[in-house]
């Protein structure tokens, strides 16, 4: 499928400033594009969102009344009107490229015109604490399955199937990887540095996790110890269970980090332990907001014991709520993470009106 090009708006920060600036840890800028066809109901819906680390800062929705790229973070609002005009033009052009790509891919897979189909793309770059390039990436999917991805060398592609190999040959002939690499190593990094500087009051803050442990009897012989980390930012965190100092990786139940709804994140990790041996187990928490890793141990006198029956009842209700949230998140994700094919052939510009996404001539799938 056509690679959705993040607009190549090149932003020339002062090189000296950029390379002398220091930030805690690594940082990322990522764009997610999604196009969903809807036969009989007009043009496909196109949604694009941009993130710096775990903070959404821009959004475009072809179904929105404004039909414009819109700010989602206070620090991006300071950009000039030309920036927003350029971003909007790029998104509208991208949506049209995706419309064509949806038809092309339907042909590749010999699909009828009746069903709805989805194209998604994620691309972006990471920088280190010194502001220098660490890595770049682009991944495309069709109908929820991998389609084609840029390899770590930023010079070659991995196609998921025969249809994707057609796209791969087209992009290789058009030197798509070379142009994309120039964006990822140059424009993407420069804009990320700019955003980190402009949004430093929020983007560079950290919230240490609030931690506690709960105890859930399963039977007369076993109990579950659950280690909780709540209200932390950024999202990256490590929870590790140990027994007598040895990692219990294989025996740990671990959930993915989840948004808490207030800009922070939450996570838990659990182990099943023999009753009476709880003191042999420790939970270790590592996070950027902590001065040093935390070690938690079950203290029966100060922490709650929750019967597993009560938990199951609670989880039934909680699960229903989460199920609805997951469905909504998946739908949003598919809309927001779609990237059409874009050829990164347009020369980079220093005009800040262009923006930080890829805005190159579209190279279709």
Curated annotation (Swiss-Prot):
Q: Where in the cell is it found?
A: Membrane
Give the transmembrane region(s): 309-332
Q: Region Disordered: what ranges? A: 338-365
Question: What is the protein's name according to its record?
Answer: Class I histocompatibility antigen, Gogo-A*0401 alpha chain
The protein's UniProt keywords, in alphabetical order, are: Disulfide bond, Glycoprotein, Immunity, Membrane, MHC I, Phosphoprotein, Signal, Transmembrane, Transmembrane helix
Name its species: Gorilla gorilla gorilla
Q: What does this protein do?
A: Involved in the presentation of foreign antigens to the immune system.
Stretches of the chain found on the membrane's Extracellular side: 25-308
In this chain, the stretch annotated as Alpha-3 covers 207-298
Organism classification = Eukaryota, Metazoa, Chordata, Craniata, Vertebrata
GO molecular function per UniProt:
peptide antigen binding; signaling receptor binding
Q: Which GO terms describe its biological process?
A: antigen processing and presentation of endogenous peptide antigen via MHC class I via ER pathway, TAP-independent; antigen processing and presentation of endogenous peptide antigen via MHC class Ib; immune response; positive regulation of T cell mediated cytotoxicity
Q: By its UniProt entry, which SUPFAM superfamilies does this protein fall under?
A: Immunoglobulin, MHC antigen-recognition domain
């Amino acid at each position: 499928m056509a690679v959705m090009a993040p607009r190549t708006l090149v932003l020339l920060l002062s090189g000296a400033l950029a390379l002398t600036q220091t930030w805690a840890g690594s940082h990322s800028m990522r764009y997610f594009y999604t196009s969903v066809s809807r036969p009989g109901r007009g043009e496909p819906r196109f949604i694009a969102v941009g993130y710096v680390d775990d903070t959404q800062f821009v959004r475009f929705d072809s179904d929105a009344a404004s039909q414009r790229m819109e700010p989602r973070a206070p620090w991006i609002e300071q950009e000039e009107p030309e920036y927003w005009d350029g971003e909007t033009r790029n998104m509208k052009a991208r949506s049209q490229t995706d419309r064509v790509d949806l038809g092309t891919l339907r042909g590749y897979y010999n699909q009828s015109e009746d069903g709805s189909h989805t194209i998604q793309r994620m691309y972006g770059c990471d920088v280190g604490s010194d502001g220098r390039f660490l890595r770049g990436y682009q991944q495309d999917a069709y109908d929820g399955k991998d389609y084609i991805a840029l390899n770590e060398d930023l010079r070659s592609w991995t196609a998921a199937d025969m249809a994707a190999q057609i796209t791969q040959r087209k992009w290789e002939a058009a030197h798509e990887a070379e142009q994309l690499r120039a964006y990822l190593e140059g424009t993407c990094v420069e804009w990320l540095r700019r955003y980190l500087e402009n949004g430093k009051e929020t983007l560079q803050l950290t919230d240490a996790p609030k931690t506690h442990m709960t105890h859930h009897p399963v039977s007369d012989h076993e109990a579950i110890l659950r280690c909780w980390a709540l209200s932390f930012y950024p999202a990256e965190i490590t929870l590790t269970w140990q027994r007598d100092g040895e990692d219990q990786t294989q025996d740990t139940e671990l959930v993915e980090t989840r948004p808490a709804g207030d800009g922070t994140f939450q996570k838990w990790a659990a182990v099943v332990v023999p009753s009476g041996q709880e003191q042999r187990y420790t939970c270790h928490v590592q996070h950027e907001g902590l001065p040093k890793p935390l070690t938690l141990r079950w203290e029966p006198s100060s922490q709650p014991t929750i019967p597993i029956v009560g938990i199951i009842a609670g989880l039934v209700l909680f699960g229903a709520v989460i199920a609805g949230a997951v469905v909504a998140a998946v739908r949003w994700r598919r809309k927001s993470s779609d990237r059409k094919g874009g050829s990164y052939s347009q020369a980079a510009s220093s005009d800040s009106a262009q923006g930080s996404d890829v805005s190159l001539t579209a190279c279709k799938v």
